[in-house]
Each structure stands twice: as C-alpha cells, then as structure tokens.
C-alpha cells in the first residue's frame, strides 16, 4: 500500500544511505576508472504562479538546451542522444515545477526521448515501471537522497495513462490552470490526497506541456496560446497525431534520402482532415527534437554539406533508401522528360504535374547521388551557366555531370560546377538549365509525392497571424474566417496568398529594414524565396535576413527584413 491508502500495486526499493548535501533534487554517481564522481543532474525550474508566454517559452528552450548537445543535427533538426554508450551521469535532467500554492515537485526526464520517467515530492520518489533492466538500473541514480522510493506497476505510455485516468487525451484540458492543478495532484499523492485517476490525468498534462512541447515547436505554440489567453482546452487532432507520430517521423527523417521519405506519414489538421507528409520540408519548423533512430550513413549529405560529428557506438546505420518521387519546382510545375522520350540528350522541362505513373515525371534518388528516370540520369550538358539539362545513359555520360546534391533549402546543385538546377521561365515547356546560384524562386525545388502547395496560417508575435492586405502584409488577430490569413507554401520556396496564388511574399531589396510586400510572382526572384527554419525564423536565403515585425509593434503594420536576433518578433509558426 502507498502511504495514504490508495490501492495500487507498488514495489518499494530498499534505500541505501547516501551522503546528503541538502539538495532536493538528489545526486547521481558514476563509476569511472574506479573513482566515484558525484554529479547533480541539471535542474530547470518553472512556476505556474504568474506564468507568461515568455516565461514558458524560456522554460521550454532551457529544457531543449539540456536535452541535447547539438552535436547531432539532421536536416536542421537536433537529434537526442543515443542511449548506447551514454554515461549515466548524462542520462537525465530534472524539471522542478511549483505553483501558486507554493507546492513543488521535480520531474525526471530521460534525455534519450525527452519523456518523464518519474518524479519527486518531498521525501518520496515515484517511477513508472521501466521497460527493461537497463532502464530499471538507470533510475536508481535518480533522487538518491529520498527516504521512500516507489515504482508503479504501470508504465508511462499514453494508452495506459488514459486507461487509468478514464479519459482520452483529446478530452483532457491543457493550459496553465491544468498544469497548476497537476502539480498539486502530484504533490498530494504522497500523502494520500490524490486518487490514481487524478494522478494519471496529471501525468498526461505534465507530459504534454513539457515533454511534447520540448519535442515539437508546434505543440509549444499551442501551449503558448493557452497561456496567453488564460485558456483551458483539450488538444486538437493536429496535436494528438504529432504526439503519436513522433517516433515514426524521427525514423522517416533520419532514413530519408536527401529529405525525401521512403513512404509517407499521415497527419491531421486541426479540423481532423488528414494529409500525408512525403518529405522533411514542412517538418523543419514543426519538430524541435528527434529521437535517435540510426546513425547517418557514410555517404549521406547533410544540410549545406555540413555533417554532424557524433560517435557511432553500434552498427545501426540508417537505411538510406532510394525513393521514387516527383520533383516540383517553379509555379508548382514538375521536372519532366520532354515528350516522354528517353533518347540521350533529350531535354528536361517544366510541365504540369501528373497524377499517373508515367515514367517521365518519376525520379529515383539514388545513393550514388544520381537522379534517375526510367533508369537514365538527370545530366547537365556541361559546367557553364546556361547549359541545358538532359536525360542521358548513366554509364556513358560524364560521371560528374550526373551527380547532384539536394539541400534542405530546396537547392539542387551539381557539385562539379557549383551550378544549380533552374527554370528561367515559369511556363510549361521551359527547358531546365544550370545557373549561378542566387537562391531565386526559379532555382527552388522539392522532391516529393505531394505536388500541391501546403496551405497554412502563419502565427507570429503575440499570437497574431500574418495577413495579406492588397499589396501589403502585416499581422492581425487570427481568425479562421479570414481567407487573407491563408498562405500557400510552394515547392519553389515562395509563400503565396491563398486568395491569389499569382502573387508572392516579396522583398524587392536585399538590405535590412526593407518592407516586405505582396507582388507578382512573375520575376521568381531571390526576394521571393523563403525557408522556414528550425529556430522559428523565416529566412530569405539570398540576403540572409529574416522576417521581422518592425519594432515589435503590430500597429505599425509593417513586416521587414532584419538580421537575425531571435526575439519574439522574428519567430513564426505554420499552423495546420
């Protein structure tokens, strides 16, 4: 029986006598070279008393900063540590939560998955039932100075917690108020003041508002909205499906070939409608952390050719598949072998994307960095700007002319020449060439099997939405009824008002404080190509400047280009 009399099967561990240094979070010890080194796990604090959007944002950023070293970053998304070879003194972080009632509990998070493994309240510590002996041994290093240690008979997965709570996540409210109540419930469980269903419900709240918010910028954004408006509400389908898909998304991204998935992953929008994700591009601003799934293959190409330096303690190398995709570019048109004729030297062109299985728009991304259609290679005619791109036999073409790298920002580059794939016109039938890279819309591409632009709202400073207003753009109160707040994200890197897809979000100059406008997409210029970054900014690739709410003052009704500083007026989030 647990103190207080709640009926629950628990196992009580004998507690060894430890030297106590007065810390409420406990000390962990690791044995190296026959020496014992005490080390306190890092502690991050958060209080619901007077919580603000900024205090919560700072808290989640601090949690992320402690969960990952930043040594392993793939497609701009940090990867959590591999549990194999991870020293025990680096295995956990502690999150100390307090509330208006001045009650305090300390959660323990596993750095390998950002998940809660247990918590401390006063002189008692409680742990979810571990999945294996290794985890069972690891948690013995947590809260070593408590008088009482208990392990629940249940694990911490959502299915079991929902069963115990008697409710599903989609019916459990989240927000600052629910978190306040959850802290009290966890605290009073040690005295018998909390029943098991309430305890399970409280775990669900804490896990979503801390672990899931650390994993996803999207979920962090949802929690910020609740705090901003002092709102209590249950998560919508977009949140639930992200939570359920984190492991599969991590696997798909790490096993992707230059960002393209071997098979799609289905997610849901806020209204419950389903959509499939075929590539990493839309996920870069959505996912903050990935669980480690596999080591990068030796030949894999990373964002802008920067390879992460991480130790490989085992042989679990990523699959490195060879997906078959369409390559979507300027104005949503596809890379196409002209007239479906595969004789050597036939031109590659822009053409409306097909929905059938015609080979001349299907491209295999090969491990050798060739891009092939019907077994033949996408090949540049030479290494000078302006030469055309053709289909050619892979075995007889010049090897360097058939090699391409696909960057996360949508650039397809020939390494030999440092020239990039380009469409100098946005019309159907335009012959593709290679050109000097200026990060223009005419040089933006996306290997995917979803040929339609991704439609989204874009939320920025103070939870306000980016809105097109004739030729101007600024932020206003968000409303699902406002069509002018809907944006189509094109594969070529342009951001277009859903109401008029012939227009583009545009900077007509590359200098700081240039006012961003809505202008014709016709130029397909460098000032019309953008990238959603993992840090929440929207980057103009050519200038290196980001979208910024001028002076953090929405009343000025100006969005400008500005150097990166990372303040809230430069942070944006696509919501679906």
UniProtKB/Swiss-Prot annotation:
2-alpha repeats lie at residues 462-497. This is Ricin. AMP binds at residues 115-116, 156-158. Residues 303-314 form a propeptide. Disulfide-linked dimer of A and B chains. 2-beta repeats lie at residues 501-540. Its EC number is 3.2.2.22. One of its GO terms (molecular function) is AMP binding. Keywords: Disulfide bond, Glycoprotein, Hydrolase, Lectin, Nucleotide-binding, Plant defense, Protein synthesis inhibitor, Repeat, Signal, Toxin. It holds the Pfam family Ricin_B_lectin. Changing residue 132 to A: No effect on the toxic activity but Suppresses the vascular leak syndrome. It comes from the Eukaryota. Changing residue 111 to A/M: No effect on the toxic activity or the vascular leak syndrome. 2-gamma repeats lie at residues 543-570. Residues 321-448, 451-575 form the Ricin B-type lectin domain. 1-beta repeats lie at residues 374-414. GO terms for biological process: defense response; killing of cells of another organism; negative regulation of translation. In the N-terminal section; belongs to the ribosome-inactivating protein family. Type 2 RIP subfamily.
